[in-house]
A protein has these predicted regions:
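General small-molecule cofactor/ligand-binding pocket signal
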Residues: 12, 95, 120-125, 138-140, ...
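Active-site neighborhood of divalent metal-dependent phosphoester bond hydrolases
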Residues: 85-123, 277
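A short helix->loop->beta-strand "cap" motif at the edges of active sites that frequently abuts
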Residues: 88-92, 264-268, 295
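Metal-dependent phosphodiesterase/nuclease catalytic metal-binding core
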Residues: 2-3, 31, 125-271, 282-287, ...
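Conserved beta-strand hairpin/beta-sheet module of binuclear metal-dependent hydrolase folds
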Residues: 2-56, 91, 151-153, 160, ...
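Active-site metal-binding motif and surrounding structural segment of the metallo-beta-lactamase
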Residues: 45-95, 123
Length: 312
């Protein structure tokens, strides 16, 4: 795949509950299919079963942990063991804030004595980035009780639209040469003239942006990261009634999540990480967020799948 973005960007919510599982919601986990790459963001207890239920597959390339509270990472123990039992040989990289190396090594050793595949653990700080195939995942420091990160998946810019009439006017041969120009290569036209991509392509098109807040109080770093994002996934553990509890535990209310989306001018907001008290009825959270943010809002549920369309 070229560095000109991706075609597929599909999200599957594996777990949407805060702190403890419920009948309807598992602990935190999000699978992101970025063309051929499969990424996990957090891996709460039971995530591997959710991956089986919702058909994401186990061919995970990287796991990004927002922080190391138990409900966000203890599922890695069983997941690693299952990968080993399945005969995996390709490398796996685990990313997260400090103390990722210590905690993840301990977790992995609880599950297996020896791994049949290479495992790398990388600690990330605010501003760090990881390059993928057609995208970059950036780390953003947030405000939680422990060291915690939000993540920004930014698709690479895509070439501008191909001007067919202009290409024909420049005597570009139809077929493979059209594709070469769209991939950023120059070609020789039938009249012998050299045609550059800029001669037949419109303005560069921005890539899609996905922002995953993890556990956090509302903070300026997330607002900045989510500026005009295609999708902001923000935690909404509490309602207005639990504002003091949100402050104590360094979580967000649904209203605060809506306010973050509004300040960021995000194009879409999905609320997740809900307290068990809203397991059966999350309408209160949705209504409070809507009082702050006028854009599209949804409450995530386990198994929910979202595909982000390409930007024009």
């Amino acid at each position: 795949m070229s560095a000109a973005g991706m075609s597929l960007l599909r999200l599957t919510f594996l777990g949407t509950s805060a702190a403890q599982p419920t009948i309807h919601r598992n602990l935190s986990g999000l699978a992101v299919k970025a063309d051929t790459d499969l990424l996990l963001f957090d891996c709460g207890e039971g995530s591997q079963r959710q991956m089986i239920r919702f058909g994401t597959g186990f061919s995970v390339d990287s796991v990004f942990f927002t922080h190391f509270h138990a409900d966000h990472y203890l599922g890695i123990i069983g997941f690693i063991r299952t990968l080993g039992m399945g005969g995996r040989t390709q490398p796996l990289t685990l990313y997260g804030p400090h103390p990722a190396k210590r905690l993840l090594r301990q977790a992995v050793h609880l599950g297996v004595d020896a791994l049949p595949f290479p495992l790398e653990i990388v600690e990330l700080q605010h501003g760090a980035s990881v390059k993928g195939h057609g995208y970059t995942v950036g780390a953003v420091q947030v405000d939680h009780r422990v060291s915690a990160l939000a993540y920004v998946l930014q698709e690479d810019e895509r070439p501008g639209r191909f001007n067919l009439e202009r290409a024909r006017a420049l005597f570009v041969r139809e077929g493979p040469d059209f594709g070469r120009l769209q991939r950023g290569e120059s070609v020789s036209a039938s009249n012998g003239q050299l045609v550059q991509p800029a001669d037949v392509l419109g303005p560069v098109r921005p890539g899609r942006r996905l922002v995953i807040s993890g556990d956090t109080r509302p903070c300026v770093t997330v607002v900045a990261a989510a500026r005009e994002a295609d999708l902001l996934i923000h935690e909404a553990t509490f309602s207005d009634d639990e504002q003091e509890r949100a402050l104590e535990t360094r979580h967000s209310t649904a209203r605060e999540a809506g306010r973050v989306a509004k300040e960021a001018s995000a194009r879409r907001l999905i609320l997740t990480h809900l307290s068990s008290r809203y397991d059966l009825d999350s309408s209160k959270l949705l209504n409070e967020a809507r009082e702050e943010y006028a854009g599209p809002i949804e409450i995530a549920h386990d198994g929910m799948t979202v595909e982000l369309p390409l930007r024009d």
